[in-house]
Amino acid sequence: MAITLTNFTFLYMDANLKRLGDIVLGFGANVVTLLLILILTITRRNGRCNRRKSYIEKCLLYVTPALGACLSCVDLVLLVRTNRRREVILCFVPLSGFVMWIAVILSLKFACCACHVFTSQILCFWWIFRFLTDALHLNMIFTLQRVQEICLIMLDIAFGISINVLRIKQAHPKIIPLEDPLIEDDDDQKRIVRRLFLEKNGSWWDLFTFGYIGSIMKHGSVKQLELENLLTLPPEMDPFTCCENLLRCWQLQECNNYSTPSLIWSIYGVYGWPYFRLGLLKVFNDCIGFAGPLLLNRLIKSFLDTQYTFRLSKLKLKLRSSIMSVIYRKCLWVNTANRSGFSEGEIQTFMSVDADRIVNLCNSLHDLWSLPLQIGIALYLLYTQVKFAFLSGLAITILLIPVNKWISVLIASATEKMMKLKDERIRKTGELLTNIRTLKMYGWDNWFADWLKETRATEVTHLATRKYLDAWCVFFWATTPTLFSLCTFGLFALMGHQLDAATVFTCLALFNSLISPLNSFPWVINGLIDAFISTRRVSKFLCCLEHSRDFSIDSGFTSEDLAVCVEDASCTWSSNVEEDYNLTIKQVSLRVPKGSFVAVIGEVGSGKTSLLNSLLGEMRCVHGSILLNGSVAYVPQVPWLLSGTVRENILFGKPFDSKRYFETLSACALDVDISLMVGGDMACIGDKGLNLSGGQRARFALARAVYHGSDMYLLDDVLSAVDSQVGCWILQRALLGPLLNKKTRVMCTHNIQAISCADMIVVMDKGKVNWSGSVTDMPKSISPTFSLTNEFDMSSPNHLTKRKETLSIKEDGVDEISEAAADIVKLEERKEGRVEMMVYRNYAVFSGWFITIVILVSAVLMQGSRNGNDLWLSYWVDKTGKGVSHYSTSFYLMVLCIFCIINSILTLVRAFSFAFGGLKAAVHVHNALISKLINAPTQFFDQTPSGRILNRFSSDLYTIDDSLPFILNILLANFVGLLGIIVVLSYVQVLFLLLLLPFWYIYSKLQVFYRSTSRELRRLDSVSRSPIYASFTETLDGSSTIRAFKSEEHFVGRFIEHLTLYQRTSYSEIIASLWLSLRLQLLGSMIVLFVAVMAVLGSGGNFPISFGTPGLVGLALSYAAPLVSLLGSLLTSFTETEKEMVSVERVLQYMDVPQEEVSGPQSLSDKWPVHGLVEFHNVTMRYISTLPPALTQISFTIQGGMHVGVIGRTGAGKSSILNALFRLTPVCSGEILVDGKNISHLPIRELRSCLAVVPQSPFLFQGSLRDNLDPLGLSEDWRIWEILDKCKVKAAVESVGGLDSYVKESGCSFSVGQRQLLCLARALLKSSKILCLDECTANIDVHTASLLHNTISSECKGVTVITIAHRISTVVDLDSILILDRGILVEQGKPQHLLQDDSSTFSSFVRASQ
């Protein structure tokens, strides 16, 4: 920038020796610049540009400094000729400037490698440095009111700014160094990365002014932004690096034997020094706010504000990614037992709410000292104006400190209680979303929703306490400036001093500077409290012991002989040391040789699954040792699948091996299934595999383990979900086939054939190993359970052949959703354009129109009372200044006091009405969202990942609860504040408003240009946030599987990818807001300059515009100063409000989801159905309109009281019969009659409540066992105990404490088999005339299953029972059977009759199982 020194010449010619400091300042500026030029010349000597510069570049690079040198020379000549008798020192400035310009020319010619003029470090430094020195001199000249010299310097500065905003659009050339080193050191690598980042985002000047966001702003203003348009993260903001840094500090605390490692100290260790360095910038920024003149204040503060915010925001983003990554890693490395002290909802809250609150600590911690500093400086300046009169106002401030502390303690208590209830609500919401299908079949969806609303109501009670306490804080601190001015001016007048315009309006400006720190202080304290509470919560979770698995044996066996060694091990699921007596595995000793096939058997609840989990290290071993040798693959009893493609689920992070991959698919009987899927193995599996049948989910989980190629396989009842033919194939080809026959396999099973093939059998009983040995040595006295005849005989010579034949049958029927695992997961919807007015209107409706009107009216009147207070002060000053006042000082004080009281009352009304309206909106939004989701069809949940829905209930609802009311309050305050200024300025001088019109036009253009992009960025932010929570929720469900496969790092990598995308959206959003902020502040500085010049010229009487009396002039100037900041704040707060409104918009998207037809034209009596007659007439049903039907022209009749079995291969459409009967999926054609009534004409919840079902996936929610069995309280205790006894689960219930015992999350207090028995008891308690059993005995042993069928036969006489089964023995004695294949009813009739027909399908099933 060619900053000439002509203006300095005029200054120094008229200066005396008292201005020697100014001369030294200018001389020092040139000398420092010269030294820096020399340093940069030396350090950049080797960098050369290999292309010719353009004509424009040459002008800017060479002509500009040459012009500066010439002007400096002219200044020097003029100075010598006109000031021959002056001190020689006056020549130092132009002389040094001349030398400096020559150095610039030489350095650009021989040393600078800048191929783009704005990437020159030398010129950039010179532009900025000379700009600041000119500004410092401008400060002095303003105090002298030398208008001519002010104009000269402002022209000089304007010339420099005009050059800086010039852009040269061309590509950066490749730098060719003289020597290319063979190996680059780390510093070179860092410089290369840094240069690439600069080349990606723009020049140094662009970085300083955030110009590199310009291309995104232009793109976002004309079209929709996509994720690939976002800015690239700087290298130091890489989430993986941030996570590693924080993790290193945390582990350092653990290594130093800290009793309880603290997250806050770990954060300090990583970010403490960079954060406190920002404090130095903030000190300078705060202090400059009280410096003069006004122009210099605003120019410097504009850059300081944005740079401080930019660096603080980068640190906050790094901290956020660190905390979220560390929490995610901890979830992967902490075993199930140690994690049992935390519910899933609580852990999800750590990730969503607590992480944000800890990050906000960065704002609050600096504000904790910065705000008192600003208050202290303002008070000192008040002292210089009104002496000790300010102490009266200070006394009010001091009195409010203990009040604020007491309120803060109450807020902290309410916040902690609210967070616990928020955790519980998120957990319950997760349970609702996970088990929505089962809840609908039970008809409990409304009851569960009401239960969730009760929890929300309790949470809102504590939220209300917090909000109303916040309202008191806002009231106390918002009224403080008004009370301060009343007490200060009152005491000053009573002390005998006369109020003048200079004193009053200087004090008013200082009072205004007190408003922001005083109003912000309660929010700062609340933020600190929330942050420290969240820090303690997260620290407690991070202190959990991590999972470990070792192998070391000192015995006769060598590590080459043994795969598993368990020595006197006792394990518990509890993480509490005080509960060590509650053992699940008791004194177990077990040794498994390598390569053996071990069958773990036992009755339901005997500890089979717990034994496998103890081997995995998921339980806490309180005694003995458990040691494994080699890698492990694990298949849980409830299969866990990722939301992704089929191939991703099977590979599980392993490289793709074509040969092994297809061998695995064939061995697990998946080749035909996948070939029939839309997209093959690239078809998408929905959330938790909901678009697959139960058997398909089990086989995919098994295929993952088989493909993994581990040394040891722990399999938990993998054959229970498949039919006998598929089970035989899997046993032969997978478990005993070439892929696994040399591996160690430990399998919990009830499958007789698998038991007979085992090398070793382990019999579990009540958590102990009752017996172990080979199948031939097993004594019959142990249990009659396993001495039954095999269900199918592998020695059958034609069995495998039949399996191959039947495998070709198209398996495209699906138990639950669709025939093919098509890509049914819908991408998250993202709105385009501005937030519609309907969103604001809906939020107002949620808050209530009356409250909305009260808020608006009170805010306007509050601002009016404050403006009236200032106008009265102006009137008081004018009257007393002229000496013509007809009223006493006490009269003026009384009127001032009335304004103060009115303002305080209105402030209180506004604060509490805002709190009430925000709470009312929060309650209505949550309840409306729950009601809409409860009535949504199951297809919506199948196509929408639960993590995406849960994001609405966690992050978006948190915004509606907390952030949105806060930013709306700020928006309203800015709006009425600006309205008040405009009214007052209109009263003072109407023509003054004409000056604002062009500036307002520029402001509005900037705002329109910015808003469109900011909306898109906020929507991208919300969309990119959902995969994080979906991935997190998914990982919580499958963490034990991930740990077993040792795939933690793979999943951390997936999470880092999601987090990086989220960070990029946030980073782009921050840069865009700073882009706007800087330009608004710079434009505001120009407005202030213009107003100030007008005021100075107008005061001389030669200017056409007059400002009236001194009081009005002072009032106009004091109101003009905050005008620009209010304009900027209004636009910023409006944009931020629009961003926060995106959360309301996202919630409203779910208000429009399709709804089930809840009502019906026909009503039902209390005793319906009376007979239990079920009729299907030509029923066709499909889950998705684009896929083939799951049921095709199904017709059958089940007479009342009949026990009917439904069989077929895995995925044949058996469960689709129940889906149609319970109206989970509407039928395309045909009709279903129950007791002669068409069920499509019946109220849907009444229909479902009249039917009883035991689902394929047992469901127990967290709460008392009594509520799980009889949530509506319709059964007596004796009846419940009787049913529990008949369902063979009474002993298990008694062992955990009876009906009032607490069921843990997901029913993990009981085994899967016990959960199925409890679900059967729940169904029998309903005493319905129609009972549907969907594989209710799949996870229990054959003996218990036989006893249960006897119970069902005795308890369900006269009841229609529809049984879906894989075991042939389950349906052989029923009254009738239905055989399905590919959704078609291929055969029906009595089992005995079908057996007599050798050509029947049922006969072939029986022959294959004999």
Swiss-Prot record:
ATP 1 binds at G602, E603, V604, G605, S606, G607, K608, T609. This is ABC transporter C family member 13. The keyword S-adenosyl-L-methionine does not apply. One of its GO terms (molecular function) is ATP hydrolysis activity. It catalyses: ATP + H2O + xenobioticSide 1 = ADP + phosphate + xenobioticSide 2. InterPro entries: AAA+_ATPase, ABC1_TM_dom, ABC1_TM_sf, ABC_transporter-like_ATP-bd, ABC_transporter-like_CS, ABC_transporter_C-like, P-loop_NTPase. It is found in: Membrane. Residues 564-791, 1174-1407 form the ABC transporter domain. Belongs to the ABC transporter superfamily. ABCC family. Conjugate transporter (TC 3.A.1.208) subfamily. GO terms for cellular component: membrane. Gene3D superfamilies: ABC transporter type 1, transmembrane domain, P-loop containing nucleotide triphosphate hydrolases. Ubiquitous. The keyword ATP-binding applies. PROSITE patterns: ABC_TM1F (PS50929), ABC_TRANSPORTER_1 (PS00211), ABC_TRANSPORTER_2 (PS50893). Its EC number is 7.6.2.2. Residues 255-530, 852-1139 form the ABC transmembrane type-1 domain. It comes from Arabidopsis thaliana (Mouse-ear cress). Keywords: ATP-binding, Membrane, Nucleotide-binding, Repeat, Translocase, Transmembrane, Transmembrane helix, Transport.
